[in-house]
């Protein structure tokens, strides 16, 4: 009798834990933000203390420096799309994979990763900051890493009452 009770309590606990974890995070939730020329559809990356983190990935700021544009000054992208998906992390710039890349993302140390088509910015903003009616500070971060680690879609420094822009 005692064993049946333990099994029932365990099953109920597991069901409740699954129910709570399934409602805490929705990786498919989308969010739109409008600029003067474009509507960007972003995504919700995580929820922390009931505060969502909105991410807008892959917003181009220049034409890709590939083919005839390689080793030239950046070129304007021209008229942006009217509606743009900003839900996928863009390419990182070419670099040799370092220890952090091998641990976090499964690359081999010293492997060449990335792509020259990498002139994108990524914008992160908390739910509280997004709902604010006042203008907020914007932090622009050009990641370091000496071309051996890091990328503009790294979300480690994004929990603040400001817009965070990573290049």
Regions found by a protein language model. Name each.
Residues 22-167:
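Non-catalytic accessory segments of hydrolases
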Residues 9-17:
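Bacterial N-terminal signal peptides
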Residues 1-9:
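Bacterial N-terminal signal peptides that target proteins for export
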Residues 2, 15, 88-91:
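Glycine-centered signal
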């Amino acid at each position: 009798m005692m064993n049946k009770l333990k099994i029932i309590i365990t099953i109920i606990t597991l069901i409740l834990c699954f129910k709570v974890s399934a409602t805490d995070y929705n990786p498919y939730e989308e969010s739109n933000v409008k600029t003067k020329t474009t509507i960007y559809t972003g995504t919700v990356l995580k929820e922390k203390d009931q505060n969502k983190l909105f991410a807008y990935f892959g917003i181009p700021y220049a034409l890709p420096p590939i083919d005839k544009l390689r080793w030239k000054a950046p070129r304007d992208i021209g008229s942006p799309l009217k509606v743009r998906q900003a839900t996928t992390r863009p390419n990182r710039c070419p670099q040799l994979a370092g220890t952090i890349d091998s641990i976090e993302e499964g690359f081999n140390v010293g492997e060449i990763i990335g792509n020259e088509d990498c002139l994108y910015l990524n914008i992160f903003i908390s739910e509280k900051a997004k709902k604010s009616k006042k203008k907020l500070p914007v932090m622009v971060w050009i990641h370091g890493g000496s071309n051996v680690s890091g990328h503009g879609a790294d979300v480690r420094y994004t929990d603040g009452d400001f817009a965070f822009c990573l290049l």
